[in-house]
Amino acid sequence: MNLLAIGAAIAALTGIGAGVGIGIATGKAVEAVSRQPEASGKIMQLLLLGGALAEATAIYGLLVAIMIIIFKP
């Protein structure tokens, strides 16, 4: 049972990576918009796409953690 809890915790750590990645991307997007305000529309589109992909990894990690806890392989 201990190893299952450790495995679930490691799978749930994907949320930390996603949070850091989204934070860095948002900071760079703000810098880019401050340099080129006319490109803000395109930058926001790319930021939303990148944020969605990064958040998907966190959701997959959460699902794996839940599956480890519930199904106990």
Swiss-Prot record:
Transmembrane segments: 4-24, 51-71
Keyword Signal: no
UniProt membrane topology term: Multi-pass membrane protein
Site positions per UniProt: Reversibly protonated during proton transport: 55
GO molecular function, one term: proton-transporting ATP synthase activity, rotational mechanism
Keywords: ATP synthesis, Cell membrane, CF(0), Hydrogen ion transport, Ion transport, Lipid-binding, Membrane, Transmembrane, Transmembrane helix, Transport
Residue pairs linked by disulfide bridges in the UniProt entry: none
SUPFAM superfamilies with a match to the protein in the record: F1F0 ATP synthase subunit C
Function comment: F(1)F(0) ATP synthase produces ATP from ADP in the presence of a proton or sodium gradient. F-type ATPases consist of two structural domains, F(1) containing the extramembraneous catalytic core and F(0) containing the membrane proton channel, linked together by a central stalk and a peripheral stalk. During catalysis, ATP synthesis in the catalytic domain of F(1) is coupled via a rotary mechanism of the central stalk subunits to proton translocation. Key component of the F(0) channel; it plays a direct role in translocation across the membrane. A homomeric c-ring of between 10-14 subunits forms the central stalk rotor element with the F(1) delta and epsilon subunits.
Family membership: Belongs to the ATPase C chain family.
Assembly with partners or alone: F-type ATPases have 2 components, F(1) - the catalytic core - and F(0) - the membrane proton channel. F(1) has five subunits: alpha(3), beta(3), gamma(1), delta(1), epsilon(1). F(0) has three main subunits: a(1), b(2) and c(10-14). The alpha and beta chains form an alternating ring which encloses part of the gamma chain. F(1) is attached to F(0) by a central stalk formed by the gamma and epsilon chains, while a peripheral stalk is formed by the delta and b chains.
Protein name in UniProt: ATP synthase subunit c
